[in-house]
Amino acid sequence: MQLVTERLYLQSITAEDWPLFLRLYQDPEVIRYIADPLSEAAIRERFDARLPVWDKHGDQWLCLVMREKHSGEAVGITGFRPQWLPYRQAEVGYGSLPAGQGKGYGKESLRAVLDFAVNACGFHKLTATVTSGNLASRGLLESCGFQLEGTLRDNFRLAGEWRDDWLFGLLAAEFQGGK
């Protein structure tokens, strides 16, 4: 599968994308709000779970590699995972290498993913969970129309400390109205 934006190709992850996935999960800045450092075997398990052919009626991640059109360079991953079927909800997720940050690729790719999820797949609501303190992720979601729906206090243990999780949501009607 492939989505195309002004500056990016978003392509289904393949076995050849293992080096990118490993770099993302081993970069302390990329992973610092996602998980404590993981073993290579644990990262491989997450990667392998994203390789099967995606189905909107399933429960696995649609994982798309973000590639710059002009260079072909992979700069991150983005996608979503169906949840709460048959109520047509999905959770979005993304991560960019430092070289891909600060260029607007996150917003560009997330808007394409939202368009696909809402208009091609018929999802009613998209959600995101962000660890408190991750202001870049929060800003990205809010710039795409997501609203803060609540805070789960001391919900996630990271670096030996309990952290709050911010819950964000975007209804299909809000996304379509904001295009």
List each language-model region with its residue ranges.
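Conserved GNAT-fold acetyl-CoA-binding loop/helix
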Residues: 29-51
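Acyl-donor (CoA/ACP) binding surface of acyl/acetyltransferases
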Residues: 1-27, 31, 66-179
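A short helix-loop-beta-strand connector motif used in the catalytic cores of GNAT acetyltransferases and
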Residues: 51-65
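Short, conserved alpha-helical segments within structured domains
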Residues: 38-39, 62, 133
